[in-house]
């Protein structure tokens, strides 16, 4: 459950280490984002020679949340932290590698590239 001002880890190799959610996309009154939702983020901490710089604004897709996601069989998949993958204007991942597991819920949407790059799909 991500809202404005939420800090997230970055699960790709773009050079960003942490980002802050500045907007949840998908309606003017939308308050929360879950796994698979697109948000606008500002880079808060970046590696010195990374592809992105501190202060830049990007779209991102949420790939892990501490709140978790409920499956139709009743199981709940939770993670230790919130994480996102940075996207370009065409909603394709900017990085070429994904770190850590992602959930199967990303497969049904338009993020097959992220699922194929991920080392583990839960």
Curated annotation (Swiss-Prot):
Gene3D superfamilies from the UniProt entry: Ribosomal protein L14
Ribosomal protein in keyword set: yes
CDD domains according to UniProt: Ribosomal_uL14 (cd00337)
Any single Gene Ontology cellular-component annotation: cytosolic large ribosomal subunit
Membrane spanning stretches: none
One GO biological process term: translation
PROSITE patterns: RIBOSOMAL_L14 (PS00049)
Pfam families the UniProt entry points to: Ribosomal_L14
Keywords: Ribonucleoprotein, Ribosomal protein, RNA-binding, rRNA-binding
GO MF, any single term: structural constituent of ribosome
Domain of life: Bacteria
Alphabetical list of InterPro entries matching this protein: Ribosomal_uL14 (IPR000218), Ribosomal_uL14_bac-type (IPR005745), Ribosomal_uL14_CS (IPR019972), Ribosomal_uL14_sf (IPR036853)
Function: Binds to 23S rRNA. Forms part of two intersubunit bridges in the 70S ribosome.
Annotated family: Belongs to the universal ribosomal protein uL14 family.
Subunit structure of this chain's protein: Part of the 50S ribosomal subunit. Forms a cluster with proteins L3 and L19. In the 70S ribosome, L14 and L19 interact and together make contacts with the 16S rRNA in bridges B5 and B8.
Record protein name field: Large ribosomal subunit protein uL14
Record organism: Methylobacillus flagellatus (strain ATCC 51484 / DSM 6875 / VKM B-1610 / KT)
